[in-house]
């Protein structure tokens, strides 16, 4: 596996771990990694989103 691929895999794992921590706090927020733009997208309660992520989710 290339260094870049390994880095993406590590980031995906980190996001998954963070999502698990959030789920335990019952925030109902799900994180997943989208490959096309390499963006972290947050799905869940809109009131829990930071302004930066809210801007990213507007299409």
UniProtKB/Swiss-Prot annotation:
Keywords: Amidation, Cleavage on pair of basic residues, Neurotoxin, Secreted, Signal, Toxin. Residues 1-19 form the signal peptide. One of its GO terms (molecular function) is toxin activity. The keyword Secreted applies. The modification Isoleucine amide is found at residue 43. The keyword rRNA processing does not apply. Expressed by the venom duct. It is found in: Secreted. One of its GO terms (cellular component) is extracellular region. Residues 20-25, 45-59 form a propeptide. Its main location: secreted. Belongs to the FARP (FMRFamide related peptide) family. Neurotoxin that is active on vertebrates. When tested at high doses (10 uM), the toxin affects all zebrafish and mouse DRG neurons in culture, which could be an indication of an effect on a widely expressed receptor or ion channel found in both species. At low doses (1 uM), the effects of the toxin are confined to a specific subpopulation of zebrafish and mouse DRG neurons. In vivo, it induces long-lasting dramatic alterations in the locomotor behavior of zebrafish larvae. It rapidly induces hypoactivity and death of larvae at high doses and it causes hyperactivity at lower doses. The mature peptide does not contain cysteine residue. This is Conorfamide-Ep1.
């Amino acid at each position: 596996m290339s260094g870049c691929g390994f880095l993406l895999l590590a980031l995906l794992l980190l996001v998954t771990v963070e999502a698990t921590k959030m789920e335990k706090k019952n925030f109902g927020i799900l994180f997943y990694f989208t490959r096309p733009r390499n963006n972290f997208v947050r799905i869940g309660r809109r009131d829990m989103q930071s302004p930066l992520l809210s801007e990213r989710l507007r299409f």
